């Protein structure tokens, strides 16, 4: 374990992972569109779901076999753990409301983990592979749904996503207090540099600021769709006025 390579932020392996995360959902969605096959789409969903589940189970088996963590550190209480469940449910049920949560958690939370990972070990260590398989798999699943099923967030999506996030915060904070582990980084900031590094070291002020950051991310993630909707309404209104004058 001690001879594992050290993770280098934005080194070649990290950049390769980011590139694959960006490109792969477009490739998969392009395959579905070209074939117009529901069987292909279901197969892709099955593969993505299986990879996410098997990777998580393999991670638990490996860390348990190494004896590096006890049960309190192995609970499925990280946001990406919940994100795995949500994105799998969204892919299989095809329900907009599950997608909304997967979108805000997957793009807002998991994307931060991909860009600024709290990770000590580099490629080809299994912890590097497992970490990015789970986090990138969530993002790939979310973007795949957006491209193939035209899913997108709406104004009320922010409210529903926020309520689900508050539920996660409450449950996870209780677990953190009981176990003493920092699930969801609710007790203190992660070691790796990230947006959370700018928050206060004082708790519970840090937790309050964390809520503000989460809400800001939600608004930023919805902003492109709000701009598109506003531009579309303006275009339609302008076209209607022109037709009325003819």
What does each of the following model-derived ranges do?
Residues 4-22, 161-163, 167, 179-218:
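Membrane-interface transmembrane-helix boundary segments in multi-pass integral membrane proteins
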Residues 32-45, 92-98, 149-158:
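Membrane-interface helix-boundary motifs at transmembrane edges
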């Amino acid at each position: 374990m001690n001879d594992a390579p050290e993770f280098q932020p934005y080194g070649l392996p990290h950049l390769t992972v980011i590139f694959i995360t960006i490109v792969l959902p477009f490739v998969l969605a392009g395959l579905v569109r070209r074939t117009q096959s529901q069987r292909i789409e279901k197969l892709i969903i099955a593969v993505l779901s299986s990879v996410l589940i098997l990777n998580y189970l393999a991670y638990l088996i490996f860390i348990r076999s190494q004896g590096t963590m006890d049960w309190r550190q192995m609970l499925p209480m990280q946001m990406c753990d919940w994100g795995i469940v949500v994105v799998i449910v969204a892919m299989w049920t095809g329900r907009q409301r599950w997608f909304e949560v997967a979108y805000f958690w997957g793009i807002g939370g998991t994307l931060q983990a991909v860009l600024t990972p709290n990770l000590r070990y580099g490629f080809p260590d299994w912890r590097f592979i497992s970490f990015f398989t789970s986090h990138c798999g969530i993002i790939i699943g979310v973007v795949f749904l957006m491209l193939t099923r035209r899913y997108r967030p709406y104004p009320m999506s922010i409210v529903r996503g926020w309520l689900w996030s508050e539920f996660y915060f409450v449950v996870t904070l209780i677990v953190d207090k009981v176990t003493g582990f920092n699930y969801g980084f609710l007790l203190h900031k992660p070691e790796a540099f990230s947006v959370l590094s700018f928050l206060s070291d004082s708790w519970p002020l840090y937790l309050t600021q964390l809520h503000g950051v989460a809400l800001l991310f939600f608004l930023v993630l919805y902003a492109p769709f709000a701009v598109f909707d506003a531009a579309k309404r303006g275009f339609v209104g302008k076209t209607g006025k022109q037709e009325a004058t003819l």
